[in-house]
Amino acid sequence: MKIVDLAAMEYAEAFALQERLAADVAAGRAEETLLLLEHPPVYTLGRRGDGGSLPDPSVRPVEINRGGDVTWHGPGQLVGYPILDLGCRGRDLHRYLRFLEQVLMDAAASLGVQAWRVAGRTGIWTEGGKLASIGVGVRRWVTMHGFALNICNDLAPFSRIHPCGIVGCPVTTLSREAGRAITVAEAKAAVAAPFAGLPADALPEQPRDAVQPSSCDDVHAPSTTSRRPPCPLTV
């Protein structure tokens, strides 16, 4: 698999590149590719979004063909677009989403931050809030779009939306959770490694103990701490 570091790129340009690569991978003209980059500030709205997650009427998101609701991209946030052929990996979109979550949890752990899944949600969380968002699209079983991992970005833009359609859910960054400055370059290295070693015909099995129960009222890790859980699951 090819890992391509694009540094910074406008959203429309990156989307056009994804479309070209996805078509080429589906036709056997190109190898699978992971695009890693940052975007200038932009809001995007996936297929699940209906405007209810946009309490600020001045927000004008780019409507795109990925799953999920509304989110924000900007400097200091690592965006990853894997262009993968799921046709030779079991055609299991659910397993692919869990694979992306595991990659991000492992990357966060390597940088000193514990993160976890929440049943019924897609993405990863910490005690401080949502750390990464995931939204994908598939054409001819080739993936597009992917994940956005908050590293050291400004969190103020998230206050103008209900991130991923979740009302009242705080958003956090790796740097905030680690209590130190983490760079996008550090995160790129941690995220890229699992893709570089990905088998051509399978997705790894995912552990089951990283998922918190869907019946919980909050997305927080089990612990003895008395801190107030940060993120009510209200939609």
From Swiss-Prot:
EC number from the UniProt entry: 2.3.1.181
Record-annotated active site: C164 (acyl-thioester intermediate)
Location in the cell: Cytoplasm
Region span, Disordered: 202-235
Annotated GO biological process: protein modification process
UniProt keyword Cytoplasm present: yes
Record-level Gene Ontology MF annotations: lipoyl(octanoyl) transferase activity
Pathway annotation: Protein modification; protein lipoylation via endogenous pathway; protein N(6)-(lipoyl)lysine from octanoyl-[acyl-carrier-protein]: step 1/2
Positions with a binding annotation for substrate: R66, G67, G68, D69, V70, T71, W72, H73, S133, I134, G135, G146, F147, A148
Reaction catalyzed: octanoyl-[ACP] + L-lysyl-[protein] = N(6)-octanoyl-L-lysyl-[protein] + holo-[ACP] + H(+)
Pfam families: LplA-B_cat (PF21948)
Keywords: Acyltransferase, Cytoplasm, Transferase
Protein function: Catalyzes the transfer of endogenously produced octanoic acid from octanoyl-acyl-carrier-protein onto the lipoyl domains of lipoate-dependent enzymes. Lipoyl-ACP can also act as a substrate although octanoyl-ACP is likely to be the physiological substrate.
Misc: In the reaction, the free carboxyl group of octanoic acid is attached via an amide linkage to the epsilon-amino group of a specific lysine residue of lipoyl domains of lipoate-dependent enzymes.
Stated family: Belongs to the LipB family.
Protein name (database record): Octanoyltransferase
Species of provenance: Geobacter sulfurreducens (strain ATCC 51573 / DSM 12127 / PCA)
Gene: lipB
